[in-house]
């Protein structure tokens, strides 16, 4: 019998213009765009990754400007397995606002949803956010923290793969005998339209 791939739903949140879409394009296409031009609204990206010999189907939602108007709602967070909370390392306010985003995610996302704090634009010289403070903040919340650069492809893939691995560990997936994924995931995936990249 052919074994179904594991299916996971992820999203990436944070203030407008912190580099969320650039992280997605680097992870999915291994390209960098200074400015992405997605239309307003949710956009779905799909990718299959191989972890420990198992194929994992990822569906990742990009807010595509919705966060600028704080228009994310309960349905956006429903059924998520993992969340990347992103700030711009050259903008202190965007880091301070990760606390608001984390609070929102804790209220609206499933209780077992894994979260990671992500610094973007690590290639910039004008870093203003103290990495030690962020690391201490993340450690106190028992969250992992990555510094990334979409432009220079620093830690981007590692961040996403770590999130996926932590989700699988949290859900106690056994890699050698997985025959079925979480209930209703196949139906949800098939209903979504968007950017499909393998």
Swiss-Prot record:
It holds the Pfam family Ras. GO terms for cellular component: plasma membrane. Residues 196-198 form a propeptide. The modification Cysteine methyl ester is found at residue 195. GO terms for biological process: vesicle-mediated transport. It is a lipid-anchor. It is found in: Cell membrane. One of its GO terms (molecular function) is GTPase activity. Keywords: Cell membrane, GTP-binding, Lipoprotein, Membrane, Methylation, Nucleotide-binding, Prenylation. InterPro entries: P-loop_NTPase, Rab, Small_GTP-bd, Small_GTPase. A motif (Effector region) lies at residues 36-44. A lipid is attached at residue 195 (S-geranylgeranyl cysteine). SUPFAM superfamilies: P-loop containing nucleoside triphosphate hydrolases. GTP binds at residues 14-21, 62-66, 120-123. NCBIfam families: small_GTP. This is Ras-related protein RabH.
């Amino acid at each position: 019998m052919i074994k179904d791939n594991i299916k996971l739903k992820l999203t990436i949140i944070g203030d407008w213009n912190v580099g969320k879409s650039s992280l997605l394009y680097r992870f999915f296409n291994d390209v960098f765009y200074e400015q992405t031009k997605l239309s307003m609204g949710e956009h779905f990206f799909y990718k299959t990754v191989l972890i420990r010999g198992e194929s994992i189907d990822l569906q990742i939602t990009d807010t595509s400007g919705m966060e600028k108007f704080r228009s994310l709602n309960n349905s956006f967070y429903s059924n998520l397995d993992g969340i990347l909370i992103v700030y711009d390392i050259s903008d202190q306010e965007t880091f301070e606002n990760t606390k608001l985003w984390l609070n929102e995610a804790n209220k609206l996302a499933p209780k077992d949803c894994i979260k990671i704090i992500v610094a973007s634009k690590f290639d910039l010289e004008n870093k203003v956010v103290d990495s030690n403070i962020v690391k201490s903040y993340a450690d106190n919340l028992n969250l992992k923290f990555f510094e990334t650069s979409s432009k220079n492809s620093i830690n981007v893939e590692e961040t996403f793969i770590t999130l996926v691995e932590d989700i699988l560990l949290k859900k106690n997936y056994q890699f050698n005998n997985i025959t079925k994924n979480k209930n209703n995931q196949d139906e949800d995936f098939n209903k979504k339209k968007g950017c499909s990249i393998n």
